Regions:
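A short acidic, Gly/Pro-enriched loop at the edge of an enzyme's catalytic core
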Residues: 87-99
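Non-membrane alpha-helical structural segments and their capping/turn regions in soluble enzymes
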Residues: 59, 111-115
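A short SAM/SAH-binding and catalytic strip from SAM-dependent methyltransferases
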Residues: 98-112
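A short glycine-rich, Lys/Arg-flanked "PGG" loop and its adjoining helix->strand segment in the class I
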Residues: 115-127
Length: 204
C-alpha cells in the first residue's frame, strides 16, 4: 500500500516531525501553534484528533488555517483559531501541553518585544509541557551578519532579523524555569542564514 506522506503530514517542519517520531507529542495532548500561518504544521495533528488551537496576526493566514481545520477536523470550533499576536493572546494560561513557535520570534523589532512574545508564548504552556521553537540565530554565521543594534542584524540573505545565540537561549531557559530537552541545534543554510531549534520542558 502506497502512503501519500505529503497528504498525511502536510508541510510540517522536519524538526517538529522529529518530536512526533520521538513520542514527545502524542494523541490526547493539547497543541497550540503560536504563529500558525496557513497551518503548515497542523495537518497531521488535526487529522489525528489532537486538540488544536492556533493564533496568527495575519487574517488571511488564520482563515486558511480555519479552512484546513474545517476539512480535517470539523469538530474543532472556529474560535480555536484566533487573529491575534502571541503577546496579547486571549487564550487562557496553561491551555496547551505543546506550544509551537516556528519562525516567529525572530520577527521581533527589538528585545523588549522579543521578550514579550516569548513570555506570551510561555504563559500558554502548562507545567510539564513542551515548547518547540525554531528561530533565526547568529550561530555559525557570526562573522557574516551585520549588527543593527539591540540584537537586530542584517543577514547575508538580505533580511533583517532579531538573532539569538546559544548563551542567550541557555540563559532564557533558566529564566523561564525550563529545562532543555535537546541540545540546541542549528542549521546553517549555505552561509546565508542560520535557523536554531530550541526545545524546552516547562518545569513545575
Amino acid at each position: 500500500v502506497r502512503t501519500d506522506l505529503g497528504a498525511l503530514f502536510g508541510s510540517i517542519d522536519v524538526y517538529l516531525f522529529d518530536q512526533l517520531l520521538r513520542g514527545r507529542i502524542v494523541p490526547g495532548m493539547r497543541v497550540l501553534d503560536a504563529g500558525c500561518g496557513r497551518g503548515r504544521n497542523l495537518a497531521f495533528l488535526l487529522r489525528e484528533g489532537y486538540e488544536v488551537r492556533a493564533l496568527d496576526p495575519d487574517p488571511v493566514a488564520v482563515e486558511a488555517a480555519r479552512a484546513l481545520a474545517r476539512r480535517l477536523a470539523p469538530a474543532i470550533p472556529e474560535s480555536s483559531f484566533r487573529r491575534e499576536t502571541v503577546e496579547d493572546s486571549t487564550f487562557p494560561d496553561a491551555c496547551a501541553d505543546v506550544v509551537i513557535s516556528n519562525a516567529v520570534l525572530h520577527f521581533a523589532p527589538d528585545e523588549a518585544i522579543f521578550l514579550a512574545m516569548l513570555r506570551g508564548t510561555w504563559r500558554l504552556l502548562s507545567p510539564g509541557g513542551l515548547l518547540f521553537c525554531r528561530l533565526a540565530s547568529s550561530i555559525g554565521i557570526e562573522g557574516l551578519v551585520r549588527p543593527l543594534g539591540g540584537r537586530r542584524f542584517s543577514l547575508p540573505d538580505g533580511t533583517d532579523r532579531f538573532l539569538v545565540d546559544e548563551a542567550y537561549l541557555v540563559d532564557l531557559t533558566a529564566e523561564l524555569g525550563g529545562r532543555l530537552l535537546d541540545p540546541i541545534k542549528t542549521t546553517v543554510v549555505q552561509g546565508q542564514r542560520a535557523m536554531t531549534t530550541w526545545v524546552v520542558r516547562r518545569e513545575g
